[in-house]
Amino acid sequence: MKVTLIAILTCAAVLVLHTTAAEELEAESQLMEVGMPDTELAAVDEERLFECSVSCEIEKEGNKDCKKKKCRGGWKCKFNMCVKV
């Protein structure tokens, strides 16, 4: 009885992990297939640079210390600009 229960729980755990991994791979493959043209990627890069520097400029005008805006998705704020990590 215990062996059967352990086997069922193990299979369920493996199934959940496999399903999660498969969904991640499918999402990555869709991103790779669809992709964005270089011009759109450049626009996204410019937006990230703009967002980070404008955030710091606004905070400086209020006589407050400039707090770096958190950049997401593999980007970080450095010298008031989002840079790819």
Swiss-Prot record:
Superkingdom of the organism of origin: Eukaryota
Main location per the UniProt record: secreted
Keywords linked to the UniProt accession: Disulfide bond, Neurotoxin, Postsynaptic neurotoxin, Secreted, Signal, Toxin
Record carries keyword Signal: yes
UniProt propeptide residues: 23-48
GO molecular function: toxin activity
Cystine residue pairs: 52-66, 56-77, 71-82
InterPro entries: Hwtx-2-like
Family: Belongs to the neurotoxin 12 (Hwtx-2) family. 02 (Hwtx-2) subfamily.
Annotated protein name in UniProt: U4-theraphotoxin-Hhn1k
